[in-house]
Structure formats: C-alpha cells, structure tokens
C-alpha cells in the first residue's frame, strides 16, 4: 500500500487530520512506519518546500534534499528519529526528534556540518571473526567488543566514522523514545536487570524522577547532550 487515509496515520506523525484524504506511507527501510515520516510528506507538509508530489519528485531527483548526507530520491523514503535532513542550496539542516507527546518533529539546526547519534541495538560476528555493530537506523558498521549493546555512537555523516562512544551506564544522559515519558531527557540513576521474561528497567532523573523500560532509553551524552535538542520547530 503506497497511500493511507490521513485519519489513520500513526500517532507519531504530527500531521493535521484535515487536508487531502490520502497520504503517502513510508517504504520499508531503515525505520518502521510507526517511527518515521515519508520524505515526501516532510518536504511538502512540514518544510513546505513544494506544493505537491510532482514538485517533490523534481527537487528530489535534482539532489536538493539529503538525509544523513546522502541524496534521497524516493518520496516514500522513511526519515526517523535522529536523522538529519540537509538542504544544501539554502544552507539549512534539521534533526528529527520527538516531542513530549511522542510525535516526530523536525528541529532546525544552527549549522549544516553536524553529526548523527545512533544506538547499538545488537552485535553480530561476521566473516573473519569481526564484530558488526547493528544500529537503530539500520546502519551496520564494523567495531569491537569495546562497544556494548545499547551504547550510543556519534557518527560523522555521510561516511559514518565513529566520532564518540557513549556508554549505556549510570550517570550518563539519556532520552526516552517510547511510553508515557517519550521525549523526556534526564540522567540515568539506576539500571535494573530483571531475571525473567519482563523488560529491564531504567530509573531516570530529569524534571521528575521516573522509571521506564530499557528499550525506550537512548544515551545522548555524558555531562551534556552531544546533539542539539532544542531550537526552532518546523511544523
């Protein structure tokens, strides 16, 4: 299915319920539909660079829109959490984050030469005994056992070299990306390992103290966030 009714879009999509009856879906890719927006919707309804999909196809085909430093030409390409959209011709860049309601929003950045934050979802051993790090945005890079599952990496884009390694440990700063505290940030106070089928949990101290499941937590820094979290929101 390439389109869905506007009224049935995922709750994470911050789009009006009024307007065209049908709206594009995301194509299968690095992010799930629930955690991403189609690039065509972003350039038309969010950034308002075009008025319709025909104009959108044209500017994408001309390489005027980059996602994580790579020209993307598919209107249905999924743009997800922490992805960076760059518009070289107007020297602007935006990062996809979540608001307090768990909706995906674009924050305008002060510069276009920025890095990307990713979480290590798991690790696998590949040919030659090398360690492959499988990241939350679908990226796979070679690493070592020094990197742990649920650690975060700051990557340069588009070449994806590791700029900084952030450990998933007590004392580091984290963002919550799911549940009732989605979009909140704070310091990791405790990681509680549960020896059962239930999820491990994490105690976070931010504006309030709260507990959330481990899978919802992404480390974003040590003493301070490694990525810009605030700024102008594009709506």
From Swiss-Prot:
SMART domains: KOW (SM00739). One of its GO terms (molecular function) is rRNA binding. Residues 37-110 form the S4 RNA-binding domain. GO terms for cellular component: cytosolic small ribosomal subunit. InterPro entries: KOW (IPR005824), Rib_uL2_dom2 (IPR014722), Ribosomal_eS4 (IPR000876), Ribosomal_eS4_central_region (IPR013845), Ribosomal_eS4_central_sf (IPR038237), Ribosomal_eS4_KOW (IPR041982), Ribosomal_eS4_N (IPR013843), Ribosomal_eS4_N_CS (IPR018199). GO terms for biological process: translation. Keywords: Ribonucleoprotein, Ribosomal protein, RNA-binding, rRNA-binding. It comes from the Archaea. Belongs to the eukaryotic ribosomal protein eS4 family. NCBIfam families: PRK04313.1 (NF003312). This is Small ribosomal subunit protein eS4. The gene is rps4e.
